[in-house]
């Protein structure tokens, strides 16, 4: 089985975008907020949004399952307040659940959290628990910077985040570190802010005792880990200068990296630097980079093709990257797959 651990619902129906526009337009007058019940999307309309996109690419590229979540840029936690974020997150998560119900062999859900700048993360616990226990989701996307590029909140190592981490450990789900849209003009969203968020989270983990407090807490850092693999020597050296244990001991029981890296040399670097046991296959198809690479004639985000070309990866290595590591990191995934096989 080929498991893609990083997929977003980027082909949403127009009705969802219209609802969001009405929600934002009502920020100054809460009495005008649209009711979630006003959003009408049929199952056939949902099918139409993925049949020609995510499902098409699954079939063409030979992948089997996508761990699927709402559009990352669309989370936009900096817009509105916590009540706006909650309604928006619930709606987006419910659409993911419906798609996973229609296509149980193709998609398994990961939830958007109703974060809001300056608001205690424990307010996200109920939505996380709902999505995991009621919808069968296997993880969450966690935004380290709900302010949208201004980094106004506590670092991820701060005890402020602990109520959320406690629930993640209790129900055995990991979080993918994923910022959302940038409202800071200095930081392009997908070219800078995403990679900055990945790199920042890693360094916050490195300089903390977080995994002493939560030895089973797990994070996936997407987009190949931001700058981390390229500067692995820097991070090893910083840890050494701080009299910390080696990174393998300090972080790599808890921190994992995906393969959303869009050229072969980048994947080669990732697989040379990061232990195979810490790499999860992912493509983020129909995501940040959607075009065809003129140098190869293939889509940039067809990342399976790159992994297949890495000559030093054994068949066992590739099995770990494509399947085994996702089954290990997403603690609820095996049981969820068994249920979908029986019902699909």
Write out the residue ranges for each language-model feature:
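Aromatic-lined glycan-binding groove of carbohydrate-active enzymes
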Residues: 4, 206-250
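Glycine-enriched alpha-helix->loop->beta-strand junction motifs that scaffold or abut catalytic
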Residues: 135-138, 169-174, 190, 214-217, ...
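Mid-to-C-terminal alpha-helical segments outside catalytic/metal-binding sites
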Residues: 1-5, 12-65, 94-102, 126-130, ...
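Structural motif corresponding to alpha-helix initiation and N-cap regions
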Residues: 48-52, 121, 125, 158, ...
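Catalytic metal-binding/acid-base residues of hydrolase active sites
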Residues: 8-10, 145-147, 180-181, 225, ...
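Active-site gating/metal-coordination segments in enzymes
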Residues: 64-201
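Proline-centered flexible-loop/turn and helix-kink motifs
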Residues: 104-105, 136, 163, 212-216, ...
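Hydrophobic faces of well-ordered beta-strands that scaffold small-molecule active sites
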Residues: 3-7, 66-68, 108-111, 140-142, ...
């Amino acid at each position: 089985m080929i498991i893609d651990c990083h997929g977003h619902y980027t082909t949403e129906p127009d009705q969802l975008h219209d609802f969001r526009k009405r929600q934002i337009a009502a920020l100054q007058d809460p009495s005008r907020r649209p009711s979630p019940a006003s959003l009408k999307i049929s199952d056939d309309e949902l099918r139409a949004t993925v049949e020609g996109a995510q499902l098409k690419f699954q079939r063409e590229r030979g992948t089997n399952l996508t761990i699927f979540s709402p559009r990352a840029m669309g989370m936009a936690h900096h817009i509105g307040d916590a009540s706006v974020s909650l309604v928006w997150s619930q709606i987006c998560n419910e659409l993911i659940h419906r798609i996973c119900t229609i296509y149980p062999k193709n998609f398994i859900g990961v939830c958007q959290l109703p974060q809001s700048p300056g608001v205690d993360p424990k307010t996200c616990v109920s939505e996380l628990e709902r999505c995991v226990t009621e919808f069968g989701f296997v993880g969450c996307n966690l935004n380290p910077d709900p302010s949208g590029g201004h980094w106004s909140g506590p670092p991820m190592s701060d005890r402020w985040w602990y109520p959320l981490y406690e629930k993640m450990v209790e129900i055995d789900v990991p979080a993918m570190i994923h910022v959302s849209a940038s409202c800071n003009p200095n930081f392009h969203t997908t070219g800078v802010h995403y990679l900055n968020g990945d790199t920042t989270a890693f360094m916050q983990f490195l300089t903390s005792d977080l995994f002493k407090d939560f030895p089973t807490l797990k994070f996936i850092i997407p987009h190949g880990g931001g700058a981390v693999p390229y500067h692995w020597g820097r991070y090893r050296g910083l840890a050494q200068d701080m009299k910390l244990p080696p990174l393998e001991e300090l972080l790599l029981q808890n921190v994992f990296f995906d393969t959303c890296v869009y050229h072969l040399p980048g994947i080669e670097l990732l697989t040379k630097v990061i232990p195979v046991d810490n790499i999860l296959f992912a493509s983020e198809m129909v995501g940040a980079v959607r075009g065809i690479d003129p140098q190869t004639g293939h889509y940039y985000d067809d990342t399976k093709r790159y992994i297949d070309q890495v000559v030093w990866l054994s068949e066992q290595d590739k099995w770990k990257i494509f399947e085994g590591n996702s089954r290990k990191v997403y603690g609820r995934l095996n049981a969820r797959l068994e249920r979908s096989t029986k019902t699909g």
